[in-house]
Design a protein with these regions (language model features):
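Basic, amphipathic "hinge/linker" alpha-helix immediately C-terminal to the N-terminal HTH DNA-binding motif
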Residues: 67-86
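A cross-family signal for key residues in well-ordered alpha-helices
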Residues: 17, 32, 83
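Short acidic, hydrophobic short linear motifs in intrinsically disordered regions
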Residues: 25-34
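Amphipathic alpha-helical dimerization/coiled-coil segments
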Residues: 83-99
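A short, conserved structural fragment
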Residues: 55-64
């Protein structure tokens, strides 16, 4: 069975989507992209707490850029989960549009 992201919060899923989209996904860059998407400020602590959880749960890998900055990359588990979620949403959207 492939990995899923169904137990993640919407905010955590959004973080995964942002990480997949950024050329160099680092904490404040992720925060900035989320703020652009939401159209409002996002609490820095909330971002880093959720990044840490996603690393601990095996959805992200963390590596150091320098002494103060970490970058994040999707794991295979995250990529499979995003793909699974995409197919799930697509099927429901197709049905909703057809109705």
């Amino acid at each position: 069975m492939s990995a899923t992201v169904k137990h993640l919060s919407a905010f955590q899923r959004d973080i995964l989507y942002v990480v997949s989209d950024l050329e160099t996904p680092y904490g404040l860059g992720i925060k900035s992209a989320l703020e652009e998407y939401y159209g409002e400020d996002v609490n820095t602590g909330r971002v880093y707490q959720n990044l840490s959880t996603l690393v601990d749960d095996g959805y992200l890998e963390k590596s150091s850029i320098d002494k103060r900055t970490n970058s994040y990359t999707l794991t295979e588990k995250a990529m499979q989960g995003i793909e699974h979620r995409h197919h799930w949403q697509e099927a429901r959207a197709d049905r909703a549009i057809a109705d």
